């Protein structure tokens, strides 16, 4: 790698990178991947600045060669590449002359045209993840962030890419060339995998002085220092049988081990009450898409323009009316909010400027829907600590809900195939080792089975919505920003397709902590009449907004089109996990792999091909009241994926608790089926801990119902 760096980069860049590494006590000969990363970053900073000037009229111009006497000023001040002292001197000088806010961290450039500092990022990972790490580290809206990746993707604050397309294309081409050169020398994989997240001060935090002495004093007996204790804790592995653990417990604990037989377990008690309601962040089986094929309109790829183009494909709009009110809400406000969206989209079309984002007017209906000024006033603890009867307010127990049939229908629909492909095969290089060949083969077979699955559509929809909402929450904290809900796919014929599901309007979003909540109003198109299952739509106000002509076997029929509107909320940590929902593909692939491995070890050869291509064989999918359901290997792949996706979409403390506690009972039942004669104590306590998680969550209630079916058939 070191040789490659010296051949590939300009000697001046190499020298600057060496200096920078030595300044931090790092050796370019040892940390070669870091050496390459620093050189790449330096080169991108220089390319970003190259040929960009400001003329005597204060306009930004691009001049690659010309009159050396022209009165031109460099548009960008390069800060990256200077030693720290000099770099801070330059930053201070800029702040003094331009009145710019002083950044906490050294930026890479200063843009004299836009009057802002610029942070350049070059990542080997996904751009949105690296962008968020940068934004979280910098924590300043004044510094503009621009991220490039080696795959040609880029991301910038407020989608403002600063430079013209040609300048950015030069940078992307150079990065792609570096990647190809590395790959041809077998260096790329190591370089790609070596990238770590943004380091923070906390990671290098050392306990010293008084705190160190206090830490050493507060250790358990027999430990002389914190280091010794850490080593012990890191290497600690509990072992020993149940009886020996019980003997160490208090003498007051009276635990007698009871035999566990087929008659011991009882079904889980599923609560009664009104039927459970839909609580996912966006509509699933009931969603309706307005789509455009082979998009080539002006501004294609900018969500706002994609959305307007999709809206224009529908001609059946009519005066909206409420068909299912929200019991507790001010329903006319939701109606006015939709009318406001339509009006402001129309205004956008009439404007001469082309804004990339749309901030809604802060009308009374939106303020109400987004909970503006509704948060209770915070009082400093110092001002009220002397109040004698200060206590936490009483909160009611959550109302229990019964299992409703709609959640099983949702799950069945998620396992079905659609007529579009939602994921592409990854462009990964040639396989070198035999194990890579097998892994690629499995991945390709699996991708073929799930690429058209509706659960995969939910994945891509979830990634888009969470990414867009988190970006808007960071970039436009005080604004009520309009965010289209968009996904992209390919038709059977391979044509690109852009889909619009509806819109989100986000509220104020000063998200300091991971759990701070941002409110949003979702408005989603649907053909589902809410009056058939009103309990499912308890949290929604539903409007009829148009009539859609549908082609059927008997000709065209007109169906009413509905808009499902609700106030919702999410947090930074939930959005981060929502962006990671692609991991569900990996989890379900690993489950399939373990099935293939089990089969391969019996046959003593790799069974991947036979596993996927033997269409006559069926596999167990799950339990139902009828018994064990079986299906093709493709159905198994899609069912496992749908379960993983629903675990993400319906994530909750109830699900966490139910999964952890029911697993214990599952293992005991499995041990009984394997004739291992399991023994238990306090089985009643285990049932209690499982059933306290069965409250009102639809996905948990469905899993409990499946668990009961499993118990019935497993113990026959």
From Swiss-Prot:
Q: Which family does it belong to?
A: Belongs to the influenza viruses PA family.
Documented EC number(s): 3.1.-.-
Query: Which residues bind Mn(2+) 1 per the record?
Result: 41, 108, 119-120
**Organism, scientific name:** Influenza A virus (strain A/Equine/Tennessee/5/1986 H3N8)
- Report motif location: Nuclear localization signal 1 (NLS1): 124-139
Q: Where in the cell is it found?
A: Host cytoplasm; Host nucleus
Which residues are involved in binding Mn(2+) 2? 80, 108
Entry keyword set: Cap snatching, Endonuclease, Eukaryotic host gene expression shutoff by virus, Eukaryotic host transcription shutoff by virus, Host cytoplasm, Host gene expression shutoff by virus, Host nucleus, Host-virus interaction, Hydrolase, Inhibition of host RNA polymerase II by virus, Manganese, Metal-binding, Nuclease, Phosphoprotein
Copy out the cofactor comment: Binds 2 manganese ions per subunit.
Name this protein carries in UniProt: Polymerase acidic protein
Q: What is known about what this protein does?
A: Plays an essential role in viral RNA transcription and replication by forming the heterotrimeric polymerase complex together with PB1 and PB2 subunits. The complex transcribes viral mRNAs by using a unique mechanism called cap-snatching. It consists in the hijacking and cleavage of host capped pre-mRNAs. These short capped RNAs are then used as primers for viral mRNAs. The PB2 subunit is responsible for the binding of the 5' cap of cellular pre-mRNAs which are subsequently cleaved after 10-13 nucleotides by the PA subunit that carries the endonuclease activity.
């Amino acid at each position: 790698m070191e040789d490659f760096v010296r051949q590939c980069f300009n000697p001046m860049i190499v020298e600057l990178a060496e200096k920078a590494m030595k300044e931090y006590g790092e050796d370019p000969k040892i940390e070669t991947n870091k050496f390459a990363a620093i050189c790449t970053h330096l080169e991108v900073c220089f390319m970003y600045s190259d040929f960009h000037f400001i003329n005597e009229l204060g306009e930004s111009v691009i001049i690659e060669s010309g009159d050396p006497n022209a009165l031109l000023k460099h548009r960008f001040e390069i800060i990256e590449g200077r030693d720290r002292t000099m770099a801070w001197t330059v930053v201070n000088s800029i702040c003094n002359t331009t009145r710019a806010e002083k950044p906490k961290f050294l930026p890479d450039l200063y843009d004299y045209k836009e009057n802002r500092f610029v942070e350049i990022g070059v990542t080997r990972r996904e751009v949105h993840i690296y962008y968020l790490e940068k934004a979280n580290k910098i924590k300043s809206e004044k510094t503009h962030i621009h991220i490039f990746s080696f795959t040609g993707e880029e991301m910038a604050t407020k989608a403002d890419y600063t430079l013209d397309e040609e300048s950015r294309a030069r940078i992307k081409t150079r990065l792609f060339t570096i990647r190809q050169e590395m790959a041809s020398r077998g260096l790329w994989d190591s370089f790609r995998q070596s990238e770590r997240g943004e380091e923070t001060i906390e990671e290098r935090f050392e306990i010293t002085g008084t705190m160190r002495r206090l830490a050493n004093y507060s250790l358990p007996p027999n430990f002389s220092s914190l280091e010794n204790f850490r080593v012990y804790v890191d290497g600690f592995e509990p072992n020993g049988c149940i009886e020996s653990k019980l003997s160490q417990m208090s003498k007051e604990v009276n635990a007698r081990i009871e035999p566990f037989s087929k008659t011991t377990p009882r079904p889980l008690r599923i609560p009664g009450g009104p039927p459970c309601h839909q609580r996912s962040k966006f509509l699933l089986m009931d969603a309706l898409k307005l789509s455009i094929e082979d998009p080539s309109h002006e501004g294609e790829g900018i969500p706002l323009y994609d959305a307007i183009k999709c809206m224009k494909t529908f001609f059946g709009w009519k005066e909206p009316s409420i068909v299912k009110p929200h019991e507790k809400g001010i329903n006319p406000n939701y109606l006015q909010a939709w009318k406001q969206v339509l009006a402001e989209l129309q205004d956008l079309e009439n404007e001469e400027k082309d804004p990339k984002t749309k901030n809604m007017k802060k009308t009374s209906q939106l303020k109400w829907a987004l909970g503006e000024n509704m948060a209770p006033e915070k009082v400093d603890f110092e001002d009220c600590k002397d109040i004698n009867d200060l206590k936490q307010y009483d909160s009611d127990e959550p109302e229990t809900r019964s299992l409703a049939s709609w959640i099983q229908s949702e799950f069945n629909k998620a396992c079905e195939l659609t007529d579009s492909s939602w994921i592409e095969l990854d462009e990964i290089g040639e396989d070198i080792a035999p194990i890579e060949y097998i892994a690629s083969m499995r991945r390709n077979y699996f991708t073929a089975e799930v690429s058209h699955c509706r659960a995969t559509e939910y994945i891509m929809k979830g990634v888009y919505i969470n990414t867009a909402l988190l970006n808007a929450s960071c970039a436009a904290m005080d604004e009520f920003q309009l965010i289209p809900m968009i996904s992209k796919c390919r038709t059977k014929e391979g044509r690109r397709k852009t889909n619009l599901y509806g819109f989100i309007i986000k509220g104020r979003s000063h998200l300091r902590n991971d759990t701070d909540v941002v409110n949003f109003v979702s408005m989603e198109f649907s053909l589902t009449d809410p009056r058939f299952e009103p309990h499912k739509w308890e949290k929604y106000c539903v409007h009829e907004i148009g009539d859609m002509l549908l082609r059927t076997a008997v000709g065209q029929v007109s169906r009413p089109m509905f808009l499902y509107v609700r106030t919702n909320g999410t947090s930074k940590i939930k959005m981060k996990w929502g962006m990671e929902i692609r991991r569900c593909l990996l989890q379900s692939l690993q489950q399939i792999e373990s099935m293939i491995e089990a089969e391969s070890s019996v046959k003593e050869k790799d069974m991947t091909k036979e596993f996927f291509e033997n269409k006559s064989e069926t596999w167990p999918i799950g339990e139902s009241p009828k018994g064990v359901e079986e299906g093709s290997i493709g159905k198994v792949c899609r069912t496992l994926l749908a379960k993983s996706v629903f675990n993400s979409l319906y994530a909750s403390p109830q699900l966490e608790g139910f999964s952890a506690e029911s697993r214990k009972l599952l293992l005991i039942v499995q041990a009984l089926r394997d004739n291992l004669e399991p023994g238990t104590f306090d089985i009643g306590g285990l049932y209690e801990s499982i059933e306290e998680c069965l409250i009102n969550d639809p996905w948990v209630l469905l899993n409990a119902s499946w668990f009961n079916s499993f118990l019935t058939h497993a113990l026959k």
